[in-house]
């Protein structure tokens, strides 16, 4: 679910119409600029919808990604994303993520950890409103 790009998703509208909606707080043009596809798929799964992966090309696009290099703002937003996806586990994910992603981040592990925790904390405040 975490490795999927929006343009790789197709679905039957009638299956999701009354069950799942995009979380508009996530995605380009919103507060948190990525993660909408991951949230959408996890929400589909949590609502009992079936998710399939087909290793078949259905479209071709230039190799572009919002996840190639994580700047400080991206790291912060990933913290919010992990809080949205895994509310009970997100705190336990911070250190492993900081270690695994340190090579694609434009900062050190201490700052990665701090930014992830800040994203988690700020998103929790939004949830509590």
Name the predicted role of every residue range:
Residues 11, 36, 54:
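A conserved hydrophobic position in a structured secondary element of the catalytic/binding core
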Residues 21, 27-39:
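Acidic donor-binding loop at a coil-to-helix junction in glycosyltransferase catalytic cores
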Residues 68-129:
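Non-catalytic, C-terminal membrane-associated alpha-helical segments of glycosyltransferases
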Residues 2, 9, 52:
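Residues that recognize and position ribonucleotide moieties
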Residues 5-21:
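Conserved nucleotide-sugar donor-binding
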Residues 43-45:
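Hydrophobic residues within well-ordered alpha-helices
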Residues 27-32, 49-70, 78-81:
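Active-site donor/metal-binding and catalytic loop motifs
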């Amino acid at each position: 679910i975490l490795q999927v790009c929006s343009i790789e998703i197709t679905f039957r509208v009638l299956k999701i119409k009354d069950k799942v909606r995009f979380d508009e707080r996530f995605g380009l043009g919103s507060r948190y600029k990525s993660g909408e596809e991951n949230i959408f798929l996890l929400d589909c799964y949590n609502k009992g919808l079936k998710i399939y992966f087909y290793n078949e090309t259905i479209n071709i696009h230039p190799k572009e990604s919002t996840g190639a290099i994580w700047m400080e703002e991206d790291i912060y937003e990933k913290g919010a994303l992990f809080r949205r996806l895994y509310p009970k586990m997100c705190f336990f994910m911070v250190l492993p993520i900081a270690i695994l992603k340190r090579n694609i981040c434009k900062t050190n592990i201490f700052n990665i950890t701090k930014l992830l925790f800040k994203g988690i904390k700020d998103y929790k405040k939004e949830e509590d409103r």
